[in-house]
A protein has these predicted regions:
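Positively charged n-region of N-terminal signal peptides that target proteins for export
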Residues: 1-6
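Bacterial N-terminal signal peptides
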Residues: 8-20
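Short, glycine-rich nucleotide/cofactor-binding loops
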Residues: 47-62, 86-91
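Short internal beta-strands
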Residues: 66, 77-84, 110-116
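A glycine-rich helix N-cap at a beta->alpha junction
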Residues: 95-123
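A short aromatic-anchored loop/beta-hairpin motif
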Residues: 102, 111, 127-142, 149
């Protein structure tokens, strides 16, 4: 179902560009990319909560699984949350930053807890890396209550 919606949205975009060039109206009534993403069942959405300051765990499990889960389509939507000591580790480690860039390019949503990032002096660097740094208590609670799957490392 989500593949059909994605193809419909992509097809509509191409058709819309062609029609715009000819002066006709684009597809109406099809869901936007945001609407299609929001229509996913919670069971198809994964939240990876990374809190550990252990580099080996990050490189050899957390980042590897999150990236492959998105690329291989094991989960339709992956949100990666950086919270606690992981914020400090990421802000100081170029190799982990490169891996995070791959995750961003794959379409993984990147978020971080601002309170923890500020404590470690990492908020600025995380923002530079494309991470949405914000209060995470309410968003994480909402993810859990809506039934998303949560993995914690």
């Amino acid at each position: 179902m989500t593949r059909i919606v994605k193809l419909s949205v992509i097809g509509c975009l191409f058709l819309g560009l062609a029609l715009a060039a000819s002066g006709s109206a684009p597809c109406e009534g099809l869901p936007s990319a945001t609407e299609a993403q929001d229509s996913l069942a919670p069971a198809d959405r994964l939240v990876v909560l990374w809190t550990s300051g252990d580099r080996d765990v990050a490189m050899n499990m957390v980042f590897m699984y999150a990236l492959n889960a998105k690329r291989a389509g094991w989960w339709a939507d992956v949100t990666f949350i950086i919270w606690g000591p992981s914020a400090k580790l990421l802000s100081e480690d170029a190799e982990l930053q490169a891996e995070l860039g791959k995750m961003k390019a794959a379409g993984i949503v990147l978020e971080a807890c601002i309170a923890c990032a500020d404590r470690y002096g990492a908020s600025g660097k995380l923002r530079e890396l494309g991470v949405d740094v914000k209060g995470m208590g309410k968003p994480l609670t909402a993810y859990i209550k809506e039934g998303r799957r949560v993995l914690t490392f």
